[in-house]
């Protein structure tokens, strides 16, 4: 009996433990409950095949999906004070930052990169909701400003993929100051007459919506994205009225003139490429599989 207890049972437990399915192998659709294999979801740009629901996409995957051949050069971002207010609520802010950096592998919520999009140089910034809800703090603000300045210096369009819960409360007024700073940087880009295109992803709210996320020359959103200042539940509790169906969703805002277009993620790259070439007055690329028309002799 001791032999069975001491040798056989541990071996059986070890064998079964090795065969356990990892927790992230299957992803559940928030709308329909459909289970999707994680590799199939990644191959489909994190769009649920049956429902079309757009899952969140991290910054690096977004950059790779947008630039030609997934190739880009990341822009070095300015360093900022880590925790100037020495903020603490239930936990120290510095500890929350460390956890977010360990979880995502990023220094903060915004990444900026340069590269080619449909053979045209562009500068792109991506806000990652996975890093403390994509909140806007000093580091994120500096990143957006640096991206806008890089676009102005290089003479490229600037594309902003926004995703945020708003200003980072742990940084107080220093966080709120990023709203006018980014707005001023947008104006500087406009003076160079280079386009600023915003892609609103789910969700984009709070101080980000009240600043750079709604100041694009062209405003695009992904299907079903929640876009607004305060959330719908907060508004309903304040005005004590039921909001219309789909209120603050991308389609509702498009119908009411707040957006220029709602674009499926599968068409996003081509749409952005066409817009950039049009606004930069670059010649249109020939359709895929078709050779350019030969010049007359």
Curated annotation (Swiss-Prot):
Gene for this chain: accD
Main enzyme class: transferase
UniProt pathway: Lipid metabolism; malonyl-CoA biosynthesis; malonyl-CoA from acetyl-CoA: step 1/1
One term of GO molecular function: acetyl-CoA carboxylase activity
Cellular compartment(s): Cytoplasm
Residue ranges that the Swiss-Prot or TrEMBL entry lists as coiled coil: none
The protein's name in its UniProt record: Acetyl-coenzyme A carboxylase carboxyl transferase subunit beta
Cited Pfam families: Carboxyl_trans
Protein family according to the UniProt entry: Belongs to the AccD/PCCB family.
Species this protein is from: Xanthobacter autotrophicus (strain ATCC BAA-1158 / Py2)
Repeat recorded as keyword: no
GO cellular component, one term: acetate CoA-transferase complex
